[in-house]
């Protein structure tokens, strides 16, 4: 890799890192609070990083998102679950890193087979989004069943039905 492309990648990575930090820390920019939960659009930035820069950089940008999600949960929680749930790096960091991994790998595999950027990007975006939503909600439900069920006002036995409804709603919006 020549110096120009190393510099280019460094600058793009820095810009995407700054965007992630802004989206995470500025209210309503990346996390949109809706009642006791928040919708996020930040995964789009991670997916773009994975598609444009590759899997490794997508994972790095996802790591930045996860770390700043955890910092935000400690410093300025926006929902009742933030302080209890998103201070756990298994929930705040791991799914975000895996968004970059899944999106980057799928884009690379599909692009190599089809040479179609748009198709590879669409599949990477869909599965990157699903990765974040499913992992965060599943980990929340499994690690904090009682707390999450109580917060959503449902019985623990009905928690995963409720979380499934949230996942579907997030997928549509």
Question: Which residues fall in each region the model found?
Answer:
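Loop-helix junctions at membrane interfaces
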Residues: 1-173
